[in-house]
Amino acid sequence: MTQRLKNLYTKTIVPKLTTNFNYSNMHEVPKIEKIVINRGIGDASQNQKIVESSLKELAMIAGQKGVVTRSKKAIAGFKLRQQMPVGVTVTLRGDRMYGFLDRLIHLALPRVRDFQGISSKSFDKKGNYSLGLEEQLMFPEIEYDKIDQVRGMDISIVTTAKTQEEGLALLKEFGLPFK
């Protein structure tokens, strides 16, 4: 799977973007640098089982073990003490990144109920894309019987693009289904 997206990038996307944006060098063409998958666990931070199940689910989805993110300071209003777990993060690069992107585009997103495409307005000024998913059940690795609660996640696709237009063109060429 990973080879398919790498070949698509080198053989199709690079020449197409080079002509569209008039790049003089193939190293100017934007590429995907990393994909960051983040899940906030919110009020479940007191329960260690929920933190472990989130870690396990993200490891199954991403194919790589995640890291528990902890609070930097105490906030009494949220009943939060310093160094309490507040989320789980996985950063993917290289082959695992391309494998996850392939599964996201071709398996997970088509399984979303009433899916009409993802918004093209979630780009920042540097061409990075952020996507929020409401449930983990869209990934084929997650079995419905094994989860305790439906939780969402945030996926950030970090590119080397300099503008929003370059980032949008790159991700459209990879096959992300924009509206």
Swiss-Prot record:
Sorted UniProt keywords: Chloroplast, Plastid, Ribonucleoprotein, Ribosomal protein, RNA-binding, rRNA-binding
Keyword rRNA-binding appears in the UniProt entry: yes
The keyword Chloroplast is assigned to this record: yes
Compartments in which it is found: Plastid, Chloroplast
GO molecular function: RNA binding; rRNA binding; structural constituent of ribosome
Highest taxon, organism lineage: Eukaryota
SUPFAM superfamilies the UniProt entry points to: RL5-like
GO biological process: translation
GO cellular component terms, A-Z: chloroplast; cytosolic large ribosomal subunit
Primary subcellular site in the record, as a coarse category: plastid
InterPro entries on file: Ribosomal_uL5, Ribosomal_uL5_bac-type, Ribosomal_uL5_C, Ribosomal_uL5_CS, Ribosomal_uL5_dom_sf, Ribosomal_uL5_N
NCBIfam families: PRK00010.1 (NF000585)
Subunit organization: Part of the 50S ribosomal subunit; contacts the 5S rRNA.
Family the entry assigns: Belongs to the universal ribosomal protein uL5 family.
PANTHER family assigned to the protein according to its UniProt record, in alphabetical order: 60S RIBOSOMAL PROTEIN L11-RELATED
This protein's name: Large ribosomal subunit protein uL5c
Lineage: Eukaryota, Viridiplantae, Chlorophyta, core chlorophytes, Chlorophyceae
Gene from which the chain derives: rpl5
